[in-house]
């Protein structure tokens, strides 16, 4: 920070304030995590200076021998971690990984069967405001009203009726395990390709704590942050026979030069995920999520599907007449960072919502365990109950800050 402080004190100030925010607040946004110092060093390295259009051994620029080493290491580590034949580590984001996957097997106007955004899906699974909904015909499936779980019979019925070219499995706000084998059986029955977006659960999959989609999907996409705990970016996994097509969809299809400094950071994070400590961490993420979910349930809060199988939970605030927006604001005032989220069969706008989404990956990285989750749960409950009392929220914030500062941003669990 010394050079930034001297050269650009305004940016230095913003970075310092963000650092203080991360250390002094409780990060419960399910799509966020905290990377290691090694990952940050790789992303801030001299690799940011290098242009490297193409792929290892087939670049359009000279001087790529060392970035070839970096990208090859990232590919090989991902193949080993997920038992995949083919990996592309160049996507700048999960959304671009999904776009490349679709373009590899679809033509504009083809039909996609994907999870409804308000039921837990992602923008790229067919939202009309996203490229997926603008380029392709979208049929949506969702969860059962009674259980909050994916209605596989409905998925199968819609697949038979609409004969989609692609079925998308995976979600951004679904707290239960997904049966990828069942999705593949449905896809095979109607002659569809199965694309799985495992962005949220990639770390759990890598640790063997969630069914892997890789043996079942024709194409698997993911982000490299979230539970995988790497830099912000994307990745594609598939079989070797899909490799040439997928490579061409990323470059020259939708991207130019890869971000080699980010790919280096991906490689470091993938290396970390190959260590036994990573499985310990992921198990703690699950244990913490289960504890936090139980704490909220015991206090009378409604959780979509009644609980969680993974790192996240969705709190339905409808019965308490609290909007997700108001809950997010109150919790942030109290030093707890969450995001408002639609719930299945939502009646409010996505800018207001009836729920909040909570995740335990970041707090687990800081070294928190089940007993700490009970404390976090009590902070959440107190802040929601006192949401209209500014003075009480300030008292809670001070307690939250004191509690948060007991934990480093990145704790080594083993």
Swiss-Prot record:
(6S)-5,6,7,8-tetrahydrofolate binds at residues 117, 121-123, 349-351. Gene3D superfamilies: Aspartate Aminotransferase, domain 1 (3.90.1150.10), Type I PLP-dependent aspartate aminotransferase-like (Major domain) (3.40.640.10). Keywords: Amino-acid biosynthesis, Cytoplasm, One-carbon metabolism, Pyridoxal phosphate, Transferase. GO terms for cellular component: cytosol. Its EC number is 2.1.2.1. Catalyzes the reversible interconversion of serine and glycine with tetrahydrofolate (THF) serving as the one-carbon carrier. This reaction serves as the major source of one-carbon groups required for the biosynthesis of purines, thymidylate, methionine, and other important biomolecules. Also exhibits THF-independent aldolase activity toward beta-hydroxyamino acids, producing glycine and aldehydes, via a retro-aldol mechanism. HAMAP family: SHMT (MF_00051). Belongs to the SHMT family. GO terms for molecular function: glycine hydroxymethyltransferase activity; pyridoxal phosphate binding. It comes from Desulfovibrio desulfuricans (strain ATCC 27774 / DSM 6949 / MB). This is Serine hydroxymethyltransferase. It catalyses: (6R)-5,10-methylene-5,6,7,8-tetrahydrofolate + glycine + H2O = (6S)-5,6,7,8-tetrahydrofolate + L-serine. The record marks 225 as: Plays an important role in substrate specificity. The modification N6-(pyridoxal phosphate)lysine is found at residue 226. GO terms for biological process: glycine biosynthetic process from serine; tetrahydrofolate interconversion. It is found in: Cytoplasm. SUPFAM superfamilies: PLP-dependent transferases. It is an enzyme of class 2 (transferase). The gene is glyA. Its cofactor is pyridoxal 5'-phosphate. Pathway: One-carbon metabolism; tetrahydrofolate interconversion; Amino-acid biosynthesis; glycine biosynthesis; glycine from L-serine: step 1/1. Homodimer.
